[in-house]
């Protein structure tokens, strides 16, 4: 029986920490901000018309009241439709921007695996058990090849993202 060598890697860590992912996150944040501003303006329009409706409905004829109610319902429907469309567009943009980053990580792992004669590489976080003596952990080597700073971790990234979110919240 042929002895197959295997490797394992923390793919999630590599994808999240690779420097190119920072650019992806920035582009997505900018798009999200623009989207929320657009939706906010639409919601404000709805709120204004709803308040006007509440204040003036008693003075309107039934025909005008029905017309204004229909207009409100159309604005609400347009808002909900745009909300769904924007969400889909953001997801598509995320997939499009992340694809080359994920491909780069996969190619890097594949090159490292081939160089070490590994038959296959597992995603470390998806395995119930890995005996380190039996396999090769490629995460550290891949981090170096992908120019991920040694001190950058998922925890430090999470803290960085939370700090950014809090700073953005404070500006609102």
Task: Describe these PLM feature segments.
Residues 1-172:
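Amphipathic, charged alpha-helical segments and their helix-to-coil junctions
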């Amino acid at each position: 029986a042929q002895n197959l060598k295997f490797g394992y890697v923390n793919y999630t860590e590599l994808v999240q920490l690779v420097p190119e992912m920072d650019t992806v996150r920035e582009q997505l944040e900018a798009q999200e901000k623009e989207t929320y501003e657009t939706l906010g303006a639409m919601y404000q329009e709805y709120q204004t018309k709803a308040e006007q409706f509440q204040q003036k409905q008693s003075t309107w004829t039934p025909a005008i009241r029905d017309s204004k109610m229909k207009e409100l319902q159309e604005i609400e429907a347009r808002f909900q439709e745009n909300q769904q469309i924007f969400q889909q567009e953001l997801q598509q943009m995320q997939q499009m921007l992340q694809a080359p980053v994920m491909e780069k990580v996969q190619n890097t792992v594949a090159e490292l695996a081939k160089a070490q004669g590994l038959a296959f590489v597992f995603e470390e976080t998806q395995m119930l058990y890995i005996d380190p003596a039996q396999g090769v952990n490629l995460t550290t080597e891949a981090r170096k090849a992908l120019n991920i700073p040694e001190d950058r971790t998922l925890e430090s990234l999470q803290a960085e993202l939370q700090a950014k979110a809090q700073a953005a919240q404070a500006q609102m």
